[in-house]
């Protein structure tokens, strides 16, 4: 059923490692795969670029890589958290990403990711958050955003006040943190902020929420928006929240017992195919693991990032 294809290979072409992958499919069925290309030690704060590879045959083969966001075009500091959204009406591809975890840009492609427009900053969108949270670090996604049936585009975001010291001397910390969203109703031209959904220290059904961050989104069959949230909470489960529009009136369902949290990026999407109940199944994938016997000395990780597993949910949950 599954076939492994090595799209990005570590320690080649000038980069030590590739992190934070993203994948999307255009209106014309071109597969776009992105990753942060990290030199040096491969850390969040290295001189990271974002590279892209395209497939014209449903992922069987991929064209040569292209650098779609080069840190040297911006200055010192990493490019990160690259998010793609295809507009399935016009075919335009919208890309949103961060530089130095403090400035956010968007750009467009009208040829299925072959080329992109010049980046334009969307600073005013994130300035709106300062009314509720004095952030110094911001990040979009990562992975991919979503487009609703109404045409609205939604990207989860996380913000930090930067007071943590876990990123080393001279770098702002990524903790403590909060989670929110941004949305666009004009095909990615302008963006507005959503409500803050949850904050570090919140009480979630008796469990303390610790450093919520990378969040993934999906529109459920009933039209509501589900956010699946990474955190460092000691319960080691993914946090689930719902909203009618992806921006307001968030309801935090709680931690999902079925979805382990190794403190790592995950992905979620809705299938294009209807099941026997005429509903589209939702697929969730992450490292389904709480062991910690492979972590190298000195790495600040709680669990090994291994054993990727696909969970299928709707109308009943089951795991494959």
Please annotate each region the language model reported.
Residues 46-92:
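Blade-loop segments of beta-propeller domains
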Residues 49-58, 106-112, 177-187, 240-245, ...:
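Beta-propeller blade signature
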Residues 19-22, 78-83, 141-144, 213-216, ...:
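Beta-propeller and closely related beta-sheet repeat lectin domains
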Residues 79-83, 96-147:
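Asp-box/WD-like beta-propeller blade repeats and closely related beta-sheet repeat scaffolds
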Residues 310-320:
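Single conserved hydrophobic/aromatic residue that forms the stacking wall/gate
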Residues 36-45, 158-174, 287-302:
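Short, conserved, GDST-rich strand-edge loop motifs in beta-rich repeat architectures
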Residues 29-33, 90-95, 151-156, 223-226, ...:
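Entry beta-strands of beta-propeller and related beta-repeat scaffolds
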Residues 238, 257-309:
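Loop/turn-rich, solvent-exposed surfaces of beta-rich toroidal or solenoidal domains
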């Amino acid at each position: 059923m599954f076939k492994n294809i090595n799209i990005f290979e570590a320690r080649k072409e000038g980069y030590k490692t590739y992190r934070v992958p993203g994948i999307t499919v255009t209106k014309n069925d071109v597969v776009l795969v992105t990753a942060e290309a990290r030199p040096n030690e491969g850390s969040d704060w290295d001189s990271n670029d974002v590279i892209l590879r395209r497939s014209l045959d449903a992922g069987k083969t991929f064209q040569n890589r292209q650098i779609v966001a080069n840190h040297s075009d911006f200055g010192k500091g990493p490019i990160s958290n690259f998010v793609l959204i295809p507009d399935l009406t016009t075919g335009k591809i919208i890309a949103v990403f961060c530089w130095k975890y403090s400035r956010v840009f968007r750009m467009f492609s009208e040829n299925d990711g072959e080329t992109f427009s010049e980046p334009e900053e969307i600073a005013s969108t994130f300035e709106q958050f300062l009314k509720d949270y004095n952030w110094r670090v911001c990040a979009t996604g990562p992975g991919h955003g979503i487009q609703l049936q109404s045409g609205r585009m939604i990207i989860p975001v996380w913000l930090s006040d930067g007071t943590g010291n876990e990123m080393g001397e001279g770098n702002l910390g990524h903790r403590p943190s909060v989670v929110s969203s941004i949305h666009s109703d004009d095909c990615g031209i302008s963006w507005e902020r959503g409500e803050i959904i949850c904050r570090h220290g919140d009480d979630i059904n008796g469990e303390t929420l610790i450093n919520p961050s990378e969040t993934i989104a999906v529109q459920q069959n009933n039209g509501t928006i589900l956010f699946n949230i990474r955190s460092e909470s000691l319960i080691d489960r993914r946090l689930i929240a719902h909203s009618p529009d992806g921006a307001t009136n968030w309801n935090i369902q709680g931690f999902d017992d079925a979805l382990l949290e190794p403190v790592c990026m995950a992905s979620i999407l809705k299938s294009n195919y209807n099941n026997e109940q005429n509903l589209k199944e939702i697929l969730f994938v992450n490292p389904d693991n709480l062991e910690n016997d492979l972590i190298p000395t000195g790495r600040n990780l709680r669990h090994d990032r291994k054993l990727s597993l696909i969970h299928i949910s709707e109308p009943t949950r089951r795991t494959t």
